[in-house]
Curated annotation (Swiss-Prot):
Zn-finger (C2H2-type) residues: 616-635, 754-779, 783-805, 842-865, 870-893, 905-927, 936-959, 1025-1048, 1055-1078, 1085-1111, 1203-1226, 1264-1286
Gene label: ZNF532
Main location: nucleus
Protein name: Zinc finger protein 532
Sorted UniProt keywords: Acetylation, DNA-binding, Isopeptide bond, Metal-binding, Nucleus, Phosphoprotein, Repeat, Transcription, Transcription regulation, Ubl conjugation, Zinc, Zinc-finger
Species of origin: Homo sapiens
Stored InterPro entries: Zn532-like (IPR045914), Znf-C2H2_11 (IPR041697), Znf_C2H2_sf (IPR036236), Znf_C2H2_type (IPR013087)
One Pfam family of this chain: zf-C2H2_ZNF592
Compositional bias (Basic and acidic residues): 32-52, 102-111, 196-206, 223-250, 303-315, 990-1017
Length: 1301
C-alpha cells in the first residue's frame, strides 16, 4: 500500500459532532486507559521500595533495556509468566513492549557458555520476559518486535516453545523470589515474604496494565530439563569456538551517586542492562553483594542460562540454535541504541573511539528442597580491565550513574497511554557484532511506551559498541542502539510518538543528542503518520496506516547512517489502534460540559435596543447571543489550536475553537462536498495566549468563520468578497418545505381560498397551496418573466406574477397563493412573502452546486470537470500533462526544438474540444441555458440561498426584522397599481435591446439635430450591466458591483449606470446623469446678446447675471432669450411632444434597481396615465374607452340616490364613503362630481385621456410655471417638487393642459 492508496480522513461526521468540548485536557482528552496505568504505576512505586528484582522481559540470553519503575510487580509478573510494561510515554520517547517471542529462525540460546554452577540461578532470571539477558543473545536477525495485546496470549504462549532460554517457568518463579529477596536486603539473601509480596503486586499489576502479556507460567515446566540439557550443549560448542577477551577501557567512568528520583516516566537505557549483565562475571558462589545501589537502576542482571539442567534441552531447541548461529556470523553491525555518556567511548563506531570496561557479575543459584530458587549476585574483579585505571566497583557505579542520569531526567509522568486492548508497541532487536567476531550478539531495546513506533529516531551517530565479558571468559561485543537515532522516518512520527506530551525531555547530550523533542500534539492524517524518508520501505507505511488492524507484521530494511555494509533487519509487530485516533474520537464524541448559552433578549424598554427574537445563534454549538459582535467574538475565541490542511481549500488553516472548524466543514458540506483533510494537529493554547486583542486575534486567526452560514462580520466579508460564489443550500436529504409568509396576517387582509385560481385545483390547507405555487417543475416547466426576467417555478406562479405587471385582478400571491385586495397586495408580496427576492441561479450539471452568476458556474465547470490536454506542436498527439508532452517530444521528435505545448480544452458535457478558453465558455451557454434554478437573496445581508425556507429561517434567526425591503424590479413600492399590459413593455424593451451606443461618444460628437440625437438614445436601453473592462453582462446590480470591485479593484457606488462605467450614490443623481449624458436632454440658456460666442448657461440665474453684468440690461427678457436658442427650443419641444418614449427609456434604467422609498421623477409621470384600461369592479367588464365605461357602470346602481364611483363602478350610500374609497383605492383626494345617472362622462373622458404633451408650447417660461398657482421656477425639477404640494391638482392640471391641446 502506497501513500497514494491511503484514504484521507473523512469529516462527514464532523458536522454532527457539535458537542465537542472546546478545552482539550492534555491528560484527559487524549489519554486512553490512563486510570489503568495509574494503578500500575502506584504498584511499581511500592515495588521499588521492597525489591530491585529485574522486571520481566524477553526470553533468551539477550541484553534488553526496558524502562520499568515496576520492581516487585515486574518480578511478580515474571513469576506468573507475564510481561508488565511501564506506563505509557517516557521522557518524550515512545517505547515498545517486551519481545513476545522470537521467530523460529531468529531465537536462540547461548547459555551454554556459562559454567554449570551458575546455570540454575541464571535460568530463573532470564525467563521469557526478562528485561536483562546475556549479551550472547545478539542475534543475526535484528528485529523490532512488539508485544501483542493481552488477548493474544495464546499466540504468545505458542511462541514460548520456540524461545531457547533453557529456563523453566518454575525456575523463574523460584529464582525471582531469591533474587528479589537479595535485592531488598542488599545482602543477597532472599525472603519468602518478599516473594509473596511480589506475587500479590503482580496480580494487581496484571489487572491494571494494558500492555501485560498474559502467559501461563507453568505450562512448560516439563520442558525444563530438556532446555537445561540444551544449555550444556550450547556451552560446550561455544567454548570450542574460542573465548573472546573484553576490550580495554581507554577512559575512566566517572563515579556519580545514583539518583533517587521517582519519576513515573523514565526512559530505559541499555547501559544499565549491559552493566548489570557484565557484572555477572565477578560473581562468586559465596559472595552475595547486590549489584545495584539505586532503586532507579531497576534492570538488574539475570542469570545466563548455563545450569546443568540445560543439558535437558530438547534437540529441536539445539537445532534452532545451531541454525541461527550460522547466518549471524555474516551480519554486520547494526545501528546502536541508547547508552551512557562514557559507554560510547572506545566503541569502533562511536565518536570517542574507545571501548568501556564492563564490570562482571557472578550469579549463584541454589535450588532448595521445596523447589524454591535462591540466587546470589556478587561483583568480581575484572580479569582484563585492570588497566582501565579504575576499580571495578567504580566502573559499576559509573555505569549505574549513567543509567540513573538517564532515568532521572525531569520529564513528568506520561500523559499518553494506549487504548486498553490495542497498544502500539515496539522493540528493537539489532545485530551488534562486527563481522570479525565469531559470536555475534543481540541487543534488544525495549522501550515501554505505547504510542507510535520510534524507528524514525534511530541514528548510528549515537551508537556505542560495548564489550561484555562473561564469567566463562567469553568476551562479547554488544552494540547499543538508540531509540532516538534512526533517521528513516519523518518528523510526523516523532510528533505522533510524543502525542500530547508537551514537556521536553532532558537527557545526557551524548546519548540523546539526536532526540527530537516534540510538544503535546495529536496528528490525524488517518493518521497520515508515515515515515517519509527514503530509507524506509513501504511495509512500514502499510503497518502505520491501518489504524483498525490490531496486529500487523512487516519486514523493513532500515539502512543505517553508518558504513554502507551495516544494515539491520527490523521486524515490526505493531498494534495500530493508536491512542491518537482514540483521543480524537473521544474529543468528538464527548458531551460538552458547558450548557448551551441563552442570552437575555428582553432589554429594558428605556434602553431603546432592538434585538432579534432568537438572537444570533452559533449553528455549531447552539449558543445564542444578543449582539452580532458577540457571535463574532464567539467564533474568534481561543480554546485549542487546531491545525488542519484542507484538501478542498488546498491550504493550511489554523482554528482556535471547534466551532470555527465545524463552520468551515459546514461550508464545504453546503457546497455539496465533504470536508477532507490530510493532516490535523491538536494543541492546547497556553493560558497567556487565550485572550488576545481583537486586532491580533483577527490577524492570527487564519480561518475562524469560513462558512457562509450565520451572522457576523466574517460572513458579510466573505460574501462581499465572493458574491459570485456558490449558493447556500440545504443537504439533499432535507425534506423540502414550503416557505410561508414571514409574518402572520392578524387583520385578515389576505385570504386563502385553498383553491388555485390558475388551475382550479383544491388543496387541504394553506401549506399545500403554498407548496403548489413554490414547487419547481422540471427544467422545461419553469417560466421566465419577459418583463423582469424573474424565473418562476411553474405555470401557476408565472400566471399570477404576470398579473402583477398587468395590475389585473385577482391579485394572487405567486409565493403562497393568498388573494389580496389591490391596496394590500404590494405590501404582502414585498414585505411578507418576499416575492422579489427571487434571483436566477445556475446549477452545475455534474455536481449540482448552484451559482448565482453564470460566469462563476463556467469557471467552476472548466476548473473542476473539464479536461485539459497538452498537444504536441509537431504531431497530433496530446497528453494530460505538459511534462508528458515534453517527454514525448524528446523521444519522438529528437533534434527538433519545440515550444510550449498547445492547450486544448475539452467540454465535459459533450466532449467537444476547443483551443481557446473563451470559445469553451461561449460553448457552455448552450448547456447552461436549461440549468437555471431559482435562488433567493436576503435583502439585508445579500446571502443567497437555494431554498426559500432557508432564507426565511436565516431572516428570523439573524435579522428578526428586515431593515430593507426588496421591491419589484420595475415598479416603485408605493406607486399605485397601473394596468399597463406587459406586452408593450416587453416589445419596446426587445426593440431597445437590439442596438447599443456609447454615451461618451455622443457627448463628444455633437449631433446637428437634437431630435435625431434623442431618437438614437431610445435604442440604448440594456437589460443589465455590462462590465467595461471584460465585457461581461450581469443581470443583477450587486453582482456587477462585486465583480468590478473584486476583479478590477474599482469601488462602485450603489447605483451604477447601465451605459457607462459611472456610478452614483442616489437614484436621483443617476437619473440626472442619464438625462444629461446619455439622452442629451440638457437645459441650456443661450445669451441672445452674444451672437459671436453663442454663450450658453446651464441655469437661468446665471444667464440673468450674465446679461446684467456684461450687457447692462437690468430686466432681461428671458422669453426672448430662450426663444432665441434653437438647441434649447428643440430640446423643449422634444421633451413636450414625445413624453412616452422618454418614459419608456427611463423605466428600464430603474428596472433592476428597487427605489425603496426614493421615487424618481420619471416614475411619477406614470400618474398621468394611471387609468388607461377601465375595469368594472362589479362584473369585471374592462374597456379602454372611458365613455363606453361610463355608459356601462350605471346599470349597477341600486337606486337613484346612491353614490357611484366613476372610476370602478362601485356604489356607496354616502358621499363620505365614496370619498374614502376614492382616496384609498384610486389615490384621489378630491372626489369628482358624482353623477346620479349618466354624469359628465365626456368631461371625465377628457380628463383621463392619456396626455401626449407634458409642456405648453410657450417655451421655457411656461414650462417652468406652476399651472395651479402660476408661480414660475428656474428649473423643471424645482417645479415638479413644488407641484407635489398641490396633490391631485398637479394631475388635474396636467390633464387639463393636455385636454386643451
Amino acid at each position: 500500500m502506497t501513500m497514494g492508496d491511503m484514504k484521507t480522513p473523512d469529516f462527514d461526521d464532523l458536522l454532527a459532532a457539535f458537542d465537542i468540548p472546546d478545552m482539550v485536557d492534555p491528560k484527559a482528552a487524549i489519554e486512553s486507559g490512563h486510570d489503568d496505568h495509574e494503578s500500575h504505576m502506584k504498584q511499581n512505586a511500592h515495588g521499588e521500595d521492597d525489591s530491585h528484582a529485574p522486571s520481566s522481559s524477553d526470553v533468551g540470553v539477550s541484553v534488553i533495556v526496558k524502562n520499568v519503575r515496576n520492581i516487585d510487580s515486574s518480578e511478580g509478573g515474571e513469576k506468573d509468566g507475564h510481561n508488565p510494561t511501564g506506563n505509557g510515554l517516557h521522557n518524550g520517547f515512545l517505547t515498545a513492549s517486551s519481545l513476545d517471542s522470537y521467530s523460529k529462525d531468529g531465537a536462540k540460546s547461548l547459555k551454554g557458555d556459562v559454567p554449570a554452577s551458575e546455570v540454575t540461578l541464571k535460568d530463573s532470571t532470564f525467563s521469557q520476559f526478562s528485561p536483562i539477558s546475556s549479551a550472547e543473545e545478539f542475534d543475526d536477525d535484528e528485529k523490532i518486535e512488539v508485544d501483542d495485546p493481552p488477548d493474544k496470549e495464546d499466540m504468545r504462549s505458542s511462541f514460548r516453545s520456540n524461545v531457547l532460554t533453557g529456563s523453566a517457568p518454575q525456575q523463574d518463579y523460584d529464582k525471582l523470589k531469591a533474587l528479589g529477596g537479595e535485592n531488598s536486603s542488599k545482602t543477597g539473601l532472599s525472603t519468602s515474604g518478599n516473594v509473596e509480596k511480589n506475587k500479590a503486586v503482580k496480580r494487581e499489576t496484571e489487572a491494571s496494565s494494558i500492555n501485560l502479556s498474559v502467559y501461563e507460567p507453568f505450562k512448560v515446566r516439563k520442558a525444563e530439563d530438556k532446555l537445561k540439557e540444551s544449555s550444556d550443549k550450547v556451552l560446550e560448542n561455544r567454548v570450542l569456538d574460542g573465548k573472546l577477551s573484553s576490550e580495554k577501557n581507554d577512559t575512566s567512568l566517572p563515579s556519580v551517586a545514583p539518583s533517587k528520583t521517582k519519576s513515573s516516566s523514565k526512559l530505559s537505557s541499555c547501559i544499565a542492562a549491559i552493566a548489570a549483565l557484565s557484572a555477572k562475571k565477578a560473581a562468586s558462589d559465596s559472595c552475595k553483594e547486590p549489584v545495584a545501589n539505586s532503586r532507579e537502576s531497576s534492570p538488574l542482571p539475570k542469570e545466563v542460562n548455563d545450569s546443568p539442567r540445560a543439558a535437558d534441552k530438547s534437540p529441536e531447541s539445539q537445532n534452532l540454535i545451531d541454525g541461527t548461529k550460522k547466518p549471524s556470523l555474516k551480519q554486520p553491525d547494526s545501528p546502536r541504541s541508547i547508552s551512557s555518556e562514557n559507554s560510547s567511548k572506545g566503541s569502533p563506531s562511536s565518536p570517542a573511539g574507545s571501548t568501556p570496561a564492563i564490570p562482571k557479575v557472578r550469579i549463584k543459584t541454589i535450588k532448595t528442597s521445596s523447589g524454591e530458587i535462591k540466587r546470589t549476585v556478587t561483583r568480581v574483579l575484572p580479569e582484563v580491565d585492570l588497566d582501565s585505571g579504575k576499580k571495578p566497583s567504580e566502573q559499576t557505579a559509573s555505569v549505574m550513574a549513567s543509567v540513573t542520569s538517564l532515568l532521572s531526567s525531569p520529564a513528568s509522568a506520561a500523559v499518553l497511554s494506549s487504548p486498553p486492548r490495542a497498544p502500539l508497541q515496539s522493540a528493537v532487536v539489532t545485530n551488534a557484532v562486527s563481522p570479525a567476531e565469531l559470536t555475534p550478539k543481540q541487543v534488544t531495546i525495549k522501550p515501554v511506551a505505547t504510542a507510535f513506533l520510534p524507528v524514525s529516531a534511530v541514528k548510528t551517530a549515537g551508537s556505542q559498541v560495548i564489550n561484555l565479558k562473561l564469567a566463562n571468559n567469553t568476551t562479547v561485543k554488544a552494540t547499543v542502539i538508540s531509540a532516538a537515532s534512526v533517521q528513516s522516518a519523518s518528523s510526523a512520527i516523532i510528533k505522533a510518538a510524543n502525542a500530547i506530551q508537551q514537556q521536553t525531555v532532558v537527557v545526557p547530550a551524548s546519548s540523546l543528542a539526536n532526540a527530537k523533542l516534540v510538544p503535546k500534539t495529536v496528528h490525524l492524517a488517518n493518521l497520515n503518520l508515515l515515515p517519509q524518508g527514503a530509507q524506509a520501505t513501504s511495509e512500514l507505511r502499510q503497518v502505520l496506516t491501518k489504524p483498525q488492524q490490531q496486529i500487523k507484521q512487516a519486514i523493513i530494511n532500515a539502512a543505517a547512517s553508518q558504513p554502507p555494509k551495516k544494515v539491520s533487519r527490523v521486524q515490526v509487530v505493531s498494534s495500530l489502534q493508536s491512542s491518537v485516533v482514540e483521543a480524537f474520537n473521544k474529543v468528538l464524541s464527548s458531551v460538552n460540559p458547558v450548557p448551551v448559552y441563552i442570552p437575555n433578549l428582553s432589554p429594558p424598554a428605556n434602553a431603546g435596543i432592538t434585538l432579534p427574537t432568537r438572537g444570533y445563534k452559533c449553528l455549531e454549538c447552539g449558543d445564542s447571543f444578543a449582539l452580532e459582535k458577540s457571535l463574532t467574538q464567539h467564533y474568534d475565541r481561543r480554546s485549542v489550536r487546531i491545525e488542519v490542511t484542507c484538501n478542498h481549500c488546498t491550504k493550511n488553516l489554523v482554528f482556535y475553537n471547534k466551532c470555527s472548524l465545524l463552520s468551515h466543514a459546514r461550508g464545504h458540506k453546503e457546497k455539496g462536498v465533504v470536508m477532507q483533510c490530510s493532516h490535523l494537529i491538536l494543541k492546547p493554547v497556553p493560558a497567556d495566549q487565550m485572550i488576545v486583542s481583537p486586532s491580533s486575534n483577527t490577524s492570527t486567526s487564519t480561518s475562524t468563520l469560513q462558512s457562509p452560514v450565520g451572522a457576523g462580520t466574517h460572513t458579510v466579508t466573505k460574501i462581499q468578497s465572493g458574491i459570485t460564489g456558490t449558493v447556500i443550500s440545504a443537504p439533499s436529504s432535507t425534506p423540502i418545505t414550503p416557505a410561508m409568509p414571514l409574518d402572520e396576517d392578524p387583520s385578515k387582509l389576505c385570504r386563502h381560498s385553498l383553491k388555485c385560481l390558475e388551475c382550479n385545483e383544491v388543496f387541504q390547507d394553506e401549506t399545500s397551496l403554498a407548496t403548489h405555487f413554490q414547487q419547481a417543475a422540471d427544467t422545461s416547466g419553469q417560466k421566465t418573466c419577459t418583463i423582469c426576467q424573474m424565473l418562476l417555478p411553474n405555470q401557476c406562479s408565472y400566471a399570477s406574477h404576470q398579473r402583477i405587471h398587468q395590475h389585473k385582478s385577482p391579485y394572487t400571491c405567486p409565493e403562497c397563493g393568498a388573494i389580496c385586495r389591490s391596496v394590500h397586495f404590494q405590501t404582502h408580496v414585498t414585505k411578507n412573502c418576499l416575492h422579489y427576492t427571487r434571483r436566477v441561479g445556475f446549477r452545475c450539471v455534474h455536481c449540482n452546486v448552484v451559482y448565482s452568476d453564470v460566469a462563476a458556474l463556467k469557471s467552476h465547470i472548466q476548473g473542476s470537470h473539464c479536461e485539459v490536454f497538452y498537444k504536441c506542436p509537431i504531431c497530433p498527439m496530446a497528453f494530460k500533462s505538459a511534462p508528458s508532452t515534453h517527454s514525448h517530444a524528446y523521444t519522438q521528435h529528437p533534434g527538433i526544438k519545440i515550444g510550449e505545448p498547445k492547450i486544448i480544452y475539452k467540454c465535459s458535457m459533450c466532449d467537444t474540444v476547443f483551443t481557446l478558453q473563451t470559445l469553451l465558455y461561449r460553448h457552455f451557454d448552450q448547456h447552461i441555458e436549461n440549468q437555471k434554478v431559482s435562488v433567493f437573496k436576503c435583502p439585508d445581508c445579500s446571502l443567497l440561498y437555494a431554498q426559500k425556507q432557508l432564507m426565511m429561517d436565516h431572516i428570523k434567526s439573524m435579522h428578526g426584522t428586515l431593515k430593507s425591503i426588496e421591491g419589484p424590479p420595475n415598479l416603485g413600492i408605493n406607486l399605485p397599481l397601473s394596468i399597463k399590459p406587459a406586452t408593450q413593455n416587453s416589445a419596446n424593451q426587445n426593440k431597445e435591446d437590439t442596438k447599443s451606443m456609447n454615451g461618451k461618444e455622443k457627448l463628444e460628437k455633437k449631433s446637428p439635430s437634437p431630435v435625431k440625437k434623442s431618437m438614437e438614445t431610445k435604442k440604448v436601453a440594456s437589460p443589465g450591466w455590462t462590465c467595461w473592462e471584460c465585457d461581461c453582462l450581469f443581470m443583477q446590480r450587486d453582482v456587477y458591483i462585486s465583480h468590478v470591485r473584486k476583479e478590477h479593484g474599482k469601488q462602485m457606488k450603489k447605483h451604477p449606470c447601465r451605459q457607462c462605467d459611472k456610478s452614483f450614490s442616489s437614484s436621483h443623481s443617476l437619473c440626472r446623469h442619464n438625462r444629461i449624458k446619455h439622452k442629451g436632454i440638457r437645459k441650456v440658456y443661450a445669451c441672445s446678446h452674444c451672437p459671436d460666442s453663442r454663450r450658453t448657461f446651464t441655469k437661468r440665474l446665471m444667464l440673468e447675471k450674465h446679461v446684467q453684468l456684461m450687457h447692462g440690461i437690468k430686466d432681461p427678457d428671458l422669453k426672448e432669450m430662450t426663444d432665441a436658442t434653437n438647441e434649447e427650443e428643440t430640446e423643449i419641444k422634444e421633451d413636450t411632444k414625445v413624453p412616452s418614449p422618454k418614459r419608456k427609456l427611463e423605466e428600464p434604467v430603474l428596472e433592476f434597481r428597487p427605489p425603496r422609498g426614493a421615487i424618481t421623477q420619471p416614475l411619477k409621470k406614470l400618474k398621468i396615465n394611471v387609468f388607461k384600461v377601465h375595469k368594472c369592479a362589479v362584473c369585471g367588464f374592462t374597456t379602454e374607452n372611458l365613455l363606453q365605461f361610463h355608459e356601462h357602470i350605471p346599470q349597477h346602481k341600486s337606486d337613484g340616490s346612491s353614490y357611484q364611483c366613476r372610476e370602478c363602478g362601485l356604489c356607496y350610500t354616502s358621499h363620505v364613503s365614496l370619498s374614502r374609497h376614492l382616496f384609498i383605492v384610486h389615490k384621489l383626494k378630491e372626489p369628482q362630481p358624482v353623477s346620479k345617472q349618466n354624469g359628465a362622462g365626456e368631461d371625465n373622458q377628457q380628463e383621463n385621456k392619456p396626455s401626449h404633451e407634458d409642456e405648453s408650447p410657450d417655451g421655457a417660461v411656461s414650462d417652468r410655471k406652476c399651472k395651479v398657482c402660476a408661480k414660475t421656477f428656474e428649473t423643471e425639477a424645482a417645479l415638479n417638487t413644488h407641484m407635489r404640494t398641490h396633490g391631485m391638482a398637479f394631475i388635474k392640471s396636467k390633464r387639463m393642459s393636455s385636454a386643451e391641446k
